[in-house]
Amino acid sequence: IIFSKHAQCRMDCRKIDESEVKEILKNGTINHKKIQNDKRGKTYPVEGFTHDKQHVRIVFAPKDDGLVVVTVIDLDTEWKCDCK
C-alpha cells in the first residue's frame, strides 16, 4: 500500500492510522456509486467502521503493482485540516 501525501495529511488530521486503512480495505464495502474514472485511472471508495467506530471512506487507486491511498474521509465528523 502506497499512501499519497494528501492521504497522509488527511489521516493525520482525522486521527486515522495505517492499521485502520488496512482494516477498511479488508472488511469495508465498495461504494459503487462513487467509483470514478479519469485519465489517471479508476478510484475505488471503500467504506466501513474502524475498530474505534469511525465511519470512514478510504479512496484507493490501483497503480502498477501497488495500491495507492488517495484520500481518507470521516463520514460523520468534519475535521479541521490544512492539507494542500
Identify the residue ranges that each predicted region occupies:
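Ribonuclease/tRNase effector modules and their secretory precursors
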Residues: 1-84
